[in-house]
Amino acid sequence: MAASALRGLAVAGGGESSESEDDGWEIGYLDRTSQKLKGQMLPIEEKKEKFKKALTTGDVSLVLELLDSGIISVDATFRYGWTPLMYAASVANAELVRVLLDRGANASFEKDKQTILITACSAHGSEEQILKCVELLLSRNADPNVACRRLMTPIMYAARDGHTQVVALLVASGAEVNTQDENGYTALTWAARQGHKSIVLKLLELGANKMLQTKDGKLPSEIAKRNKHHEIFNLLTFTLNPLEGKLQQLTKEETICKILTTDSDRENDHIFSSYAAFGDLEVFLHGLGLEHMTDLLKERDITLRQLLTMREDEFTKNGFTSKDQQKILAALKELEVEEIPFGELSEEAKLEISGDEFLNFLLKLNKQCGHLITAVQNIITELPVNSQKIALEWASPQNFTSVCEELVNNVEDLSEEVCNLKDLIQKLQNERENDPTHIPLREEVSTWNSRILKRTAITVCGFGFLFFICKITFQRK
């Protein structure tokens, strides 16, 4: 009887040889007795490989059978120290995760700082399956704030991979929104880096701090701009979600109910469709009456610095009309100020600047001040007077007022320095006039000569007129 059983194992179901890809693991085709007998004959390592294959392919029946055999534990470790639950989470198989958890698998297991929850959040699968896995793990007290060796938490992995509902569920379960990894990245930074707009909006709504910098001093908005996610850059630079922090006041159950029934994209697209953002490029074009060029420049990722250094052929290449080119080139000519590295020059070299060059510098500096005044006036006219007309909630007003106060101080310092410059020029002028060794300029010499010539001519004419009168008088006598 045993011999017949062994012969039965030689050929798998369907007439295929035992060397086939399935290796006879067709559930329900061979009888239970023959499968268990074959399982007992397999070495432990080979059985573990079969178990791993069943986990990765989602063969729940085979997993249950191997667990029931008693040879493999639900918390057994395979190569690299992974447990069955970690394998199931890595493929986002929610059914397997549930089965293993019901069998007593440890949801808080970790290997080299790699937790099962992190594995689930970074799994390759649909967001629906990943969400179910994460929800199951959290229900078994998995800690959402345990970080990996790179100090990345589950919410960072979920934000990086674009799983909006997973991010919201983690926050509702106690995940810290503003935790930073070894590079200073937060979940918001990761979402901005990868271009996940819906997650950026959701994180702002959940209280994420957009002003936290990375270790190299970059804000999430700058990370988004560097990776060419301009819409996210504008959102993070000029606006905040009007519902920022609102969900933090709700209970865990209310939050979960709200976040799982809200479509962030649909809810927020209309909110941000009408906001106006003012950057250096927008202000510059607005001052020239070229607002229609803004979208074109943004589409081609052209910054104000690049615009100021463009040549005429580059304007044509980028689709600028001749009239627009003339406006921009004229403005560039007015703004052009030759930088003089005074700190690198010797004292003698500093004195070689001509009066014309210095006057030209002052004139251009005055024009730039005028442009700055115009830019501020444009901003003032665009800002709504009534706070109720502001569609989006801004950051703390103290940030704006503090910057304005600093700007006022800088303007006052500039005014003081210009007054000092004026006094110095006046002092130099007075000293030059009183200096006996002063050599008059050619213009001054020519003016003095012209005065002498005029006086000489008047004197000659006077003598001539006097001589003419005297002559007439003598002739009459």
UniProtKB/Swiss-Prot annotation:
ANK repeats lie at residues 46-76, 80-109, 112-146, 150-179, 183-212, 216-245. The keyword Metal-binding does not apply. GO terms for cellular component: pi-body. PROSITE patterns: ANK_REP_REGION (PS50297), ANK_REPEAT (PS50088). The modification Phosphoserine is found at S17, S18, S20. It is found in: Cytoplasm. Residues 274-336 form the SAM domain. Plays a central role during spermatogenesis by repressing transposable elements and preventing their mobilization, which is essential for the germline integrity. Acts via the piRNA metabolic process, which mediates the repression of transposable elements during meiosis by forming complexes composed of piRNAs and Piwi proteins and governs the methylation and subsequent repression of transposons. Its association with pi-bodies suggests a participation in the primary piRNAs metabolic process. This is Ankyrin repeat, SAM and basic leucine zipper domain-containing protein 1. The gene is ASZ1.
